[in-house]
């Protein structure tokens, strides 16, 4: 029985119940008078209140008191909502019910010694800054992208030499937040805001002149999340993760994140075309062979990240000035050949057609994806046997 008794259950039991049901189906509960399913729970060591009360909110999550502590719950689902019966940030689901709940802000560089929840966290290891961004399921909404860009710019002002973009232990990034977009009253406009906010983050990384950057993929990455990683000077991945470097499966979405600059630069024009048109998942061995990443190692996220930090320390020591100068020269030469603004303008022109054009394929695909509507048939890029069968049927029959 996963039902939570907030008056009796200790924090560790509440967490076990919530984590046992995370993903599907979630734990059914009453929150501020609304019957919802709860997801993604984290312990809170400092905040206290009456058991069962919502005592704080932060970046879309809510903090609920237990009999001996508190837990953060980041996502809720209202299955009876006719318009939005899917997972969303808790604050979006609860809306005005949270008016009296205090906002507990926390600096990104606050000490990590106390148990709490925050999506974005920054720490330093000598001359290496590490920016963690553990977004639920890797989805990045407009607001999350804006917070991440602000955090990155803050990290870039620090007297360090290397910035590690660590993502989260489960997911690095999966690009735009389709659930938040689907929940919007204006999904086309929200899609536009979201992709521009992601592009702003990529641009901040691409144009960094003071630091070397490392994308450390502890967890899986998909769609725009893969191309965000390519904006870093060096891309390292944990051996067991999976990449999905393509957009077209989402209703022929063209994509942005400066991918038309970043992917051919690493994989070549033909390689970039094969990757984006193939629409297949990719392991790290193949990603290394194709040039998308520069290294693969580590069995666990913690082991992987420890080694990444050591490599980043080496980058900060060995020929740092020469590497930084070479980075600046390369960026200047690339900018002279074709400005980043042109790449972005071209990509967004195609995205505008996806969002606002007559072809509604993206909106239909997003709607079905978020609401878990199964496809009528296996897509042709996966069902290759159909093409083989059609080819065989067209071949002249040999006499028997």
Question: Where are the predicted features?
Answer:
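Conserved CoA-thioester-binding segment of acyl-CoA-metabolizing enzymes
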Residues: 85-166
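A structural preference for short, pocket-lining loop segments at secondary-structure junctions
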Residues: 126-131, 145-187, 200-214, 238-242, ...
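Phosphate/pyrophosphate-binding betaalpha-module
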Residues: 193-196, 200-204, 215, 226-227, ...
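Short, active-site-adjacent cap segments at secondary-structure transitions
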Residues: 170-173, 222, 375
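C-terminal extensions of enzymes
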Residues: 337-400
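C-terminal long alpha-helix characteristic of the crotonase
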Residues: 293-362
